[in-house]
């Protein structure tokens, strides 16, 4: 399960809509409890370095990722996942999403995927990569009004 405030989710949506018709991406910052549930406390936008296929691929800027990692290294918060958009496609994990997650062995992370249809958010789902079969499975995405 992943939870975040409605305000944070709205800010992520704003990023995805502003980036349309290209994919955008960013990192989710927060905490993980003993049951492996994530709580997002912040996020950081990351540049999409993919100039050739930006409409259906993202290549997260490694410097942006590293900046986010360093910003929170002496805090109780850490990178707990990634978000990205799917312009004019469903909010389901694609084979490319799966292949990349397996490549970096990101089994403990949540992946929020936002479907943006004709410039407006249509849906959002969160996914977790299973270590046992290298497939994404949907996890509950909960928003809380007062969790920011």
Language-model features: where?
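Conserved beta-strand-loop surface patch within small alpha/beta domains used
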Residues: 1-79, 88-148
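Residue-level "edge-of-site" marker
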Residues: 85
